[in-house]
Amino acid sequence: MTEVGGSIGSGSADKRYRLCRLASQEQVPLVMMLEDAGHRVNETANGRRPGDFMSLAELSRRVPLVNLACGASAGHGALTAPLSNFIAMTESASIVATGPLLVRSATGEDVTNVELGGPSVAVDSGGVVHNVVADDRAAIALARRYLAHFPLNAWESLPRRDGPDAGRRRVDLLPLIPPDSRRPHAIRPVFEALVDGGALLDVQQTSGSPIVTALAHPGGRSIAIVAIDPSVLAGTIDGDAVDKAAHFLDVADAFDLPCLFVAGNPGVLAGTSAGGQGILRHAARLFAVQHRMRVPKLHMTLRKVFGFGSSVMAMNPFDGQTVTLALPSITLGALPAAPAASGIDDPDERARVSAEQSEASVRAAARSTYDDVSTLGTSETPYWLAWTWPKVVPHGRGNGGLSVSCPDAVGGMRLRWVRPASSTCLPTWLHRRR
């Protein structure tokens, strides 16, 4: 900001373009720190020149892109942020399309940069920026922590985290999940019990909060987590949550991060407000993104899942899941039991519908919807998903394949998925040794 107000002239544009080309050429991550006044007005007529917009759009699925807003950023500089994979800003920063002077001349509105695009707008309301930090040092530290989950580029293998807490573990999740499906519970403690050191990197925690998107290292390997948070809107999915999850999954798929989906929701948000916001369009986008993913997909149903809410959380049969798990106490169906049964006059029939949903996990397992349903109340209850992770290797361009063994699978058989380096998936059924 000390040089021509931080505006982007032809020389600055050339530098930005050059850095983008270097990141592509050397196949390394690109980190941008924003504090600028946008494009320099008196150089608008300088003719056609290479730009960083196109380069950033191409890079976003090739190398990790991180954008840090460390001050006021407007116009051209601010518009580069949404092209990145991850965006963070400091508490005093702002990110706006146009600054206060232009807003005043165009609309008569007298506002400040912070009111236009401070953290409360850019993060909480708009969802443009993912995370907020205290200052520049914290922003750089967060960028390092984020990049630690990613390879240098989309062709490299994922980094492995070694440490005393990176081994296999037995975890009983049942005390963390209330048996009453109407009682909300926090979802993050569930993941903290599964991952190394209990360390989660929440991405965009304050926007679209019905869905949690986070990065972690279970068994020393990087994963992406997309989970329903029952403590927010009872786990009902709204448009902001869907958009957040879709972007997060797109980034995970680009860099071969296996993805864990955790469902526990009554479906997508209903009502006139949700319909006016295009909830079905948002939900369809998330379904399409998760369906197109080439990375290993692992699904867990904790308590309940209904309707389209199950489809957007990767619980679709024959949709490329590596492992699909559930607690035996779950309920599932096209609709929750009460609404589904409300249209039935016969009380015996209503009771039958409710009973069917309460036994849903056992019936679903028998039909191979789930690969395993853990047994409640015994020493065998620990969810073996965490033990599976050390064997999960993404089958992307730079990796040799994937092999996951599913102990105690349905029907007294052992299911072993062998996924070669190609996209072909070869399921092999093996009799369990007795």
Give short role names for the model-derived ranges.
Residues 1-426:
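Ligand-binding clefts of soluble mixed alpha/beta catalytic domains
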Residues 429-433:
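Short, intrinsically disordered C-terminal tails of secreted or membrane-associated proteins
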